[in-house]
Amino acid sequence: PEQVLVVNCPGNVSPAAIVRIRDFVAAGGTLFTTDWALRNIVEPAFPGTIEYNDRSTGDEVVRIEVVEADSPYLAGVLDGENDPQWWLEGSSYPIRVLDAEQVRVLIRSRELGERYGEEAVAVVFPYGKGEVFHMISHYYLQRTELRNARHEQAAVSYASEKGVSVDSETAEMMADLNLGDVESAE
């Protein structure tokens, strides 16, 4: 896309702004939204696609499964082979898919589905000449939870395992970090 609009969990947005956002996407823009933007932006701008299921989450971490590893939204970000985790902030909005023909689930979580009734963690759908990407929780804020031995391993060891070479200065900086800390994006 030539232009991307990021809306990270807003409060109320005016009806005029909703129309401008919808027109932006229809003209070929990409809308990237998180969490409460589901109810406040996506539902009014793109009805019948996805919605909040009215069961807000607790503050916890769930295992996720990458469904579309080749999606440009996920390229180089998540490696589905390594038991990735996702932080659900308290009061995050689970995503209910209403139009399964148009909406593609990129990431899902069985744990999220068992606890809150919806498995979708990140979705994308086309609208006009553009598209909308939405994810539960926030893109900038994650937390560490060491759930298994992989998360406790040294970050430099993981980088080496994945074929990422690091110079000695970077390796020294990474020496005290475990993989869980790196994945948490703190």
Place the predicted regions along the sequence by residue.
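Residue-level marker of intrinsically disordered, low-complexity segments enriched
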Residues: 2-4, 48, 104
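Short loop/helix-cap segments at secondary-structure boundaries that form the rim of catalytic
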Residues: 1-2, 40-45, 98
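Glycine-centered flexibility motif
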Residues: 7-8, 29, 90, 130
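A glycine-rich, often tryptophan-bearing local segment used as a flexible ligand/cofactor-contacting loop or short
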Residues: 11-86, 158, 162-163
